[in-house]
């Protein structure tokens, strides 16, 4: 995937969104974002270097944004979404960005109604010892204390 410098997340505190933000932070990107409320997840992202605000206000958006990742949990009527759309800044759903990242990697997908996080965590644990991997787990896996595992 092409390197981008400045990525903005709308709904950065969500479990899937925060995993993507952590991935891009580790890759050396500048990460900015909005969420409705602070949480342990957003605090951890801020410790890692993300700039996050909790007020719907376009003045908190940095001057340079290469693209936006959003979750459908944030309505398209949100001031910031409207701003990005009006300024022709590319906006991608979380799932599309996950697809961009994984498109050039061997991939195992886990689907279903119940047990996806547990199953993904088990697969990650098994493969982690012998193979470098990138795993988006879908929840905070206790054995990794993370929702994303990135081996270099």
Q: Which residue ranges define each predicted feature?
A:
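Pocket-edge structural micro-motifs
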Residues: 11, 54, 112
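Short beta->alpha connector loops at strand-helix junctions that form conserved
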Residues: 35, 55-56, 94-95
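ATP-dependent carboxylate-amine ligase
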Residues: 1-51, 64, 68, 86-89
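Phosphate-binding loop of NTP-binding sites
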Residues: 3, 23-29, 46, 59-63, ...
């Amino acid at each position: 995937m092409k390197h981008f410098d400045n990525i903005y997340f709308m709904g950065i505190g969500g479990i899937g969104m925060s995993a993507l933000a952590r991935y891009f932070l580790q890759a050396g990107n500048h990460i900015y974002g909005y969420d409705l409320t602070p949480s342990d997840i957003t605090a951890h992202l801020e410790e890692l270097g993300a700039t996050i605000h909790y007020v719907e206000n376009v003045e908190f958006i940095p001057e340079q944004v290469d693209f936006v990742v959003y979750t459908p949990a944030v309505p398209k009527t949100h001031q910031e979404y409207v701003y990005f759309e009006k300024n022709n800044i590319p906006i991608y759903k979380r799932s599309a960005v996950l697809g961009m990242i994984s498109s050039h990697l061997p991939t195992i997908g886990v689907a279903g109604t119940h047990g996806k996080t547990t199953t993904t965590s088990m697969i990650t644990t098994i493969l982690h010892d012998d193979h470098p991997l990138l795993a988006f787990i879908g929840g905070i896996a206790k054995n990794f204390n993370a929702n994303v595992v990135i081996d270099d």
